[in-house]
């Protein structure tokens, strides 16, 4: 499912074992934009991928969230975080991506 937020596109993809309903998409957008909102003007697209790596078998930390950001004028950057549920996985990945983007933009500013 794809949404447009100002100039930044937001896309959500789920694996076959995760039901990607409107509620999950809204949660994902809120979590990711809360973490990255201060950088939204520098991003053209965000893609969130959720997958249940163990499927029906279950298990601890088996929900994997990968978030790919496409910064304007740069190569795409991606992070992955696994956790016990979708929200926790999205929060973890969003935090990792915020740290990575802040670092990359900081490097550009120092040049």
Name each model-derived stretch.
Residues 1-111:
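N-terminal, polar/charged subdomain of small-to-medium soluble alpha/beta proteins
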């Amino acid at each position: 499912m794809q949404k447009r937020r100002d100039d930044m596109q937001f896309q959500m993809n789920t694996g076959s074992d995760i039901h990607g309903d409107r509620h999950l998409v809204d949660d994902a957008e809120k979590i990711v934009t809360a973490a990255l909102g201060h950088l939204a003007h520098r991003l053209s697209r965000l893609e969130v991928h959720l997958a249940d790596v163990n499927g029906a078998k279950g298990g601890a930390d088996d929900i994997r969230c990968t978030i790919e950001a496409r910064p304007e004028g740069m190569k795409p950057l991606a992070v992955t975080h696994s956790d016990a549920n979708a929200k926790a996985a999205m929060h973890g990945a969003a935090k990792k991506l915020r740290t990575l983007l802040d670092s990359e933009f900081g490097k550009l500013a120092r040049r």
